[in-house]
Amino acid sequence: MGKADIVIKGSKDGLTFFLDSQCDFSELAAAIETKLASADFFLVGAHVTVDVGTRQLHPDQIERLQTLFPSYGLILRGINSWADPVGQHDEEERVVLKGNRERIYQIANHLYESTERADGAARNYDYRDESASSFSPVGTAPDYAEATTEPADCFGGSPSDMQTAILTQGGDERTLLIQRTLRSGQTVRYPGHVVILGDVNPGAEVVAGGNIIVMGVFRGVAHAGAMGSDEAVVTAYRLRPTQLRIANHITRPPDEEEEGPEHPEIARIRDGMVTIERYHYGTKSYGKDV
């Protein structure tokens, strides 16, 4: 199957998957799944539109797309087609096919509740459409997927009881807020920034496409700027990582590390190396007084 069968384009509104109208649908679905699996959860929470060109989809094919993307943590917003339902093309009017969102969420939750990682720690995503107050900077924003390593029943109760949320910010940046301590064996992966209100214990791992901010002690594995950004930083009340990586730069602590200072610290790239220094509040340049 040629690479031209699927073209993926990104914009401020999310991702659009353009599918070859002449290619066998089952092959296209398999190719999409391969691409999503290889993304290693970095696309979690992304909004997706599928453009099928002049293809006229059958109901089972529509349902296949509705279940495929949510099963990898993406939000399917619509399926675009130039095909007329009765085969007439006197007016090339785009038809937008939208599935039942509640049904999509039910299927996605079922898939994740029955899935376990190889290390035995369950990874679950909650797709419920709980809207937060427009005046609150933190909330469960509609159409956003939430990632957690806790069992699914931790999402019971009202939105205020939930232990993870999306912080909506200006521009296209998104931040995953985790309000708990990460234990050994737990892994969090997110394409944006990650903020943790708690500690990160040894054996836990945090991978972020942007910055990692921990309001506690970080003793696990950190990888900020995982998509290649040298501008990403890792900051915590105390930085004691077993491994710290920013973009492609990696560092480890000495075998016999001292307890260290009692103040917030920040790790960033300086002169091609990962450096850890004191964080000075209110500065434009981390580690330096204004």
Curated annotation (Swiss-Prot):
Disulfide feature: none
Domain of life per record: Bacteria
UniProt record, GO biological process: cell morphogenesis; division septum assembly; regulation of cell septum assembly
Keywords, alphabetical: Cell cycle, Cell division, Septation
HAMAP family: MinC (MF_00267)
PANTHER family linked to this entry: SEPTUM SITE-DETERMINING PROTEIN MINC
Biological role stated in the UniProt entry: Cell division inhibitor that blocks the formation of polar Z ring septums. Rapidly oscillates between the poles of the cell to destabilize FtsZ filaments that have formed before they mature into polar Z rings. Prevents FtsZ polymerization.
NCBIfam families, per database record: minC
Subunit comment: Interacts with MinD and FtsZ.
Homology family: Belongs to the MinC family.
Name of the protein described by the UniProt record: Probable septum site-determining protein MinC
Native source species: Heliobacterium modesticaldum (strain ATCC 51547 / Ice1)
